[in-house]
Amino acid sequence: GVPCLCDSDGPSVRGNSLSGIIWLFGCPSGWHNCRDHGPTIGWCCKK
């Protein structure tokens, strides 16, 4: 999957690890949405 920035990772992608994965059709079972705003396409989810 494509990594994405969770709210807990920090305000920007620079110098922060991307702990989320982008899912186009919502987070799968056992995962949760870890970003309140964005991404534009899909959901940023993590286990």
UniProtKB/Swiss-Prot annotation:
Keyword Acyltransferase in annotation: no
Keywords, ordered alphabetically: Cardiotoxin, Disulfide bond, Ion channel impairing toxin, Nematocyst, Neurotoxin, Secreted, Toxin, Voltage-gated sodium channel impairing toxin
SUPFAM superfamilies, per the entry: Defensin-like
Top-rank taxon: Eukaryota
Gene Ontology BP annotations: regulation of signal transduction
Predominant localisation class: secreted
Keyword Transcription regulation in annotation: no
Localization per Swiss-Prot or TrEMBL: Secreted; Nematocyst
One GO CC term, this protein: nematocyst
Paired cysteines (S-S): 4-44, 6-34, 27-45
Entries under Pfam families matching the protein: Toxin_4
GO function term, MF aspect, one: sodium channel regulator activity
Name of the protein described by the UniProt record: Delta-actitoxin-Axm1f
